[in-house]
Amino acid sequence: MQLRLLTAALLLSSTALYAQTVEVSKAWVRATVPGQQATGAFMHITSRNGGKLVGVSSPAAGVMEVHQMKMEGDVMKMRAAPVLDLPAGQTVQLKPGGYHVMMMDLKQPMEKGSHVPLTLHLQDAKGLDSTLELSVPVRTLAPSATASPADAQSGHGAHKH
């Protein structure tokens, strides 16, 4: 019995360690206008050891998907990306016109100055899953290059594993 408890504790601590090797910065959600049912969330994600973003969830939206926008000829196309690779030591930018998180079936308007809870669902190179809880500010535009680190930081709330 003690061996099973120890094994479970080690497994939980290993997923906690993975989530701690993922850093999120410059996160923001685009504000909406009345009646708008979808918006985007944007951020920079850096994984020290590599892994994958396998999903995103939030109580603020009924559907959350990672999407990629890409030019095909002279037409901009948007497609769902079920998994987003997070190469070791590299920063992956989720930004307007590229990879981003689509928030659809919004439960309420996204008002400038408010914060939205987001949960990143991550997977390490060994296939272990973890989550990273964020509180993301709502803005009308992308954060400026001169924004203070506190303005650009999304926060790393409590991790749930």
Where are these regions (language model features)?
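N-terminal signal peptide c-region/cleavage motif recognized by signal peptidases
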Residues: 13-19
